[in-house]
Amino acid sequence: TFVCLNSNTKFSYPSVFATNNRKVKLDGEAYFEVSANKNKPFYVHTSKGEIKVLGTHFNLEAYSNADVFKTSLFEGKVRVRVKGNNIYLKPDQMVCYHKNGKIHLETIHDYDQFRWREGLICIKSAKLKDIMKTFTKYFGDSIVIQNKEVEHYKYTGKFRQSRGAINALRLLQKDAPFTIEQDEDKQIIYIKYRFKYIKHNYIFFKTKI
C-alpha cells in the first residue's frame, strides 16, 4: 500500500495491523494506492467519515477544520460512510460532504486538482478569498486580505509550491489592485490597497484598477 500526504496532513497507523483489517487515521489530504486483500479490508477513519477499501486508487480530502469532506476514486471501488449514509463510488467519481449535511456525487472532469502530488497548486475560476485559504494550507503562512475590493476577483492558473507564497501572490498581483506586506516573525502576509506615493513629500495617492 502506497500513501502520499499533502501539506498540513496528519496520518497515523499501528505498528502492526490487526489480523482481519487494516485501519488508519487521517486529518488532511492524501492519495492512496491500496493493495487488494478481501480478508483484510483497508479502513481510513477521519473526523467526518470513514472509507472502506478492498483494493483501489483514490484521493481523500478530510481536513478536520475544513467545510467539505471529499473522496475521489480513480480505480477500483470504495465505500464512503458519512452520517449513517453509505455511498459506493465508481472510478472517476467524487463525493462531497458539506458541513451543512448535504452530500453531492459528481463525475470527475478536472484532474488538475490532484496535481498537488507533483508540487503544483492548480486553481480554476476561484475567488481570491478562497485561493488564500488554499495558499495558507500549502504554504503555512496566514494570509489576511485587508483590501476587501479584491476578495471576489477570480483566477485560473497553476503555482509551483516550492517557490513559496510570495511568488504566487506576485503572479496574482499582476491582475489585481493590491500590495503585499509580510510579517516574517508572525508568519502573516497582508494583502493591502495598491497605492503610489511621493517619498519625500509623503503624499499618498490610492489608485484603483
Question: Would you name each region that the model predicts?
Answer:
Residues 1-199, 203-205:
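A residue-level detector for the "anchor" residue at the start of short, highly conserved motifs
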